[in-house]
Every structure is written in structure tokens, then in C-alpha cells.
């Protein structure tokens, strides 16, 4: 079974290098949580979350993310995000101003935190939509983890 999961994960994550396609894809929460186990290892060896692009579509992309620490404050000028919480709890901070902002790529800004933002607790089953241009940051509960599915939606 483990070998099958590894092969499945490798085939899904290999889509990171593939061209955008017109397709329909469905995942069960169990499938995503199995893949997230590999993200745990990636997160342990990184300063950021463990993430993997699941699919690149003509009009969007899907990402699976596992966090074992707070995220940086971020803002995407050309993409909106939809988060679907699979496991764990975190506080989503939105709006406000990014402290010490740095442009990390065209249209991508990161910073240490958000000042004057609105805080919303997220838990399993919650869905959050963050429009392009809105600062946002995930803050984890002490010692907690957070697994979520992301849909990246480009501005048109």
C-alpha cells in the first residue's frame, strides 16, 4: 500500500513540470491527506510549508500544503486563493499592511507579519477565499499542524 501511495504521489506531483491542460480532476480528502504525509517530510527539511502543485489547468492551479509553523505574510497581485482546510486549525489574518514587505517575484510580496489585519479561526472543513491583492498570513496554534488544499485563480 505504501508503495502505491508513493507512486501515486510521484505521478501527481510530477504534474508540476507539465503543461497546463483542460481537464477535470477530483480528489477525496483521504487521498489528499495521504499525499500530505509526504509534505510533512518536506516541511521538516524546509523553512516553509511542505507544498506540491497537484494540477495546472488553463484557468487555475491546485496545490496541497502542509504547515508545521506559521506562514509569512504574503500578497499575490495576480492570483486569488481559495483554501479548503483538510486537517488542523490555524488563524487566517487578512487585510491590513504587510510589515517589512519584500518583492520575491513579479507580483509576489512577502513579509514578516500583517499589521492591523482581521483574524479568522479556520478548522477542518472551512473554506476561505482571498482575493488577489489582499495581504494574508496563516498563524498556527502552538505545536499544531495545518493541512489545506489551495486553488490559485489568476486575474483575467
Predicted regions and their residues:
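A short hydrophobic beta-strand segment most commonly corresponding to one strand
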Residues: 143-156
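A short, N-terminal "cap"/entry segment at the start of jelly-roll beta-barrel domains
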Residues: 17-77
Amino acid at each position: 500500500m505504501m508503495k502505491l501511495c508513493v507512486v501515486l504521489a510521484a505521478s501527481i506531483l510530477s504534474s508540476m513540470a507539465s503543461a497546463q491542460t483542460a481537464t477535470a480532476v477530483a480528489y477525496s480528502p483521504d487521498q489528499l491527506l495521504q499525499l500530505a504525509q509526504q509534505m510533512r517530510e518536506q516541511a521538516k527539511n524546509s523553512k516553509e510549508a511542505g507544498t506540491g502543485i497537484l494540477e495546472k489547468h488553463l484557468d487555475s492551479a491546485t496545490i496541497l500544503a502542509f504547515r508545521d509553523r506559521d506562514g509569512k505574510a504574503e500578497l499575490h497581485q495576480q492570483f486569488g486563493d481559495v483554501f479548503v482546510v483538510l486537517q488542523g486549525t490555524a488563524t487566517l489574518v487578512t487585510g491590513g499592511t504587510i510589515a517589512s514587505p519584500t518583492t520575491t517575484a513579479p507580483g509576489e510580496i512577502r513579509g514578516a507579519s500583517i499589521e492591523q489585519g482581521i483574524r479568522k479561526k479556520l478548522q477542518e472543513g472551512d473554506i476561505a477565499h482571498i482575493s488577489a491583492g489582499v495581504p494574508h498570513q496563516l498563524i498556527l496554534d502552538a505545536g499544531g499542524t495545518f493541512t489545506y488544499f489551495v486553488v490559485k485563480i489568476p486575474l483575467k
